[in-house]
């Protein structure tokens, strides 16, 4: 009874006939000489290339010189303003490595040791910087990184090196 009462709302669709010619579509045409005056030549001369050897890349801000205390404080302020939870990690080897296996695993340097607990409820960058100083005192020969963790989306949003140990080959060249 129901199929006879209801009207069909389906429409027929023409079968696919292949790609249509674009000749009928409006096209803006540029003159051939219009791109001849555009040049990046002036900018290219002042650009520098990052050296491929001798300077290792760490995290988000690895292409900048080591952060001053003021710059580090501004980065942590941004992290807190973004409602991310600061977390500190440290490692004596600051890089990914594979020692006993060719496939990636837990012990290949991607996971660092967490310093204490994530700083839930942290509202001031000086709290984080004080913890960075504690890590530096306890482990002076370890790399220290700050992570911003979004506890709503449950993802790591930012990670950067807060301290490089003195004497490491990269600490003065960044």
Curated annotation (Swiss-Prot):
Major location (coarse): plastid
Boundaries of the annotated transit peptide in chain numbering: 1-45
Function summary: RuBisCO catalyzes two reactions: the carboxylation of D-ribulose 1,5-bisphosphate, the primary event in carbon dioxide fixation, as well as the oxidative fragmentation of the pentose substrate. Both reactions occur simultaneously and in competition at the same active site. Although the small subunit is not catalytic it is essential for maximal activity.
PANTHER family referenced in this protein's UniProt entry, alphabetically: RIBULOSE BISPHOSPHATE CARBOXYLASE SMALL CHAIN 1, CHLOROPLASTIC, RIBULOSE BISPHOSPHATE CARBOXYLASE SMALL SUBUNIT, CHLOROPLASTIC 2
Additional remark text: The basic functional RuBisCO is composed of a large chain homodimer in a 'head-to-tail' conformation. In form I RuBisCO this homodimer is arranged in a barrel-like tetramer with the small subunits forming a tetrameric 'cap' on each end of the 'barrel'.
Stated family: Belongs to the RuBisCO small chain family.
Protein name according to UniProt: Ribulose bisphosphate carboxylase small subunit, chloroplastic 1
Organism: Triticum aestivum
């Amino acid at each position: 009874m129901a199929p006879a009462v209801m009207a069909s709302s389906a429409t027929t669709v023409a079968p696919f006939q292949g790609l249509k010619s674009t000749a009928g579509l409006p096209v803006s045409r540029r003159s051939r000489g219009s791109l001849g005056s555009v040049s990046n030549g002036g900018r290219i001369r002042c650009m520098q290339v990052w050296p491929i050897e001798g300077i290792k890349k760490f995290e988000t801000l690895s292409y900048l010189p080591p952060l001053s205390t003021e710059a580090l404080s501004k980065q942590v302020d941004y992290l807190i303003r973004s409602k991310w939870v600061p977390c500190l990690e440290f490692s004596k080897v600051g890089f990914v490595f594979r020692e006993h296996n060719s496939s990636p695993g837990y012990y290949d340097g991607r996971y660092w040791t967490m310093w204490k607990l994530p700083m839930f409820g942290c509202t001031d960058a000086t709290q984080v910087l004080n913890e960075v100083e504690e890590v530096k005192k306890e482990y002076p020969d370890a790399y220290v990184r700050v992570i911003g963790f979004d506890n709503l989306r449950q993802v790591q949003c930012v990670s950067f090196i807060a301290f490089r140990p003195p004497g490491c080959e990269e600490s003065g060249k960044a």
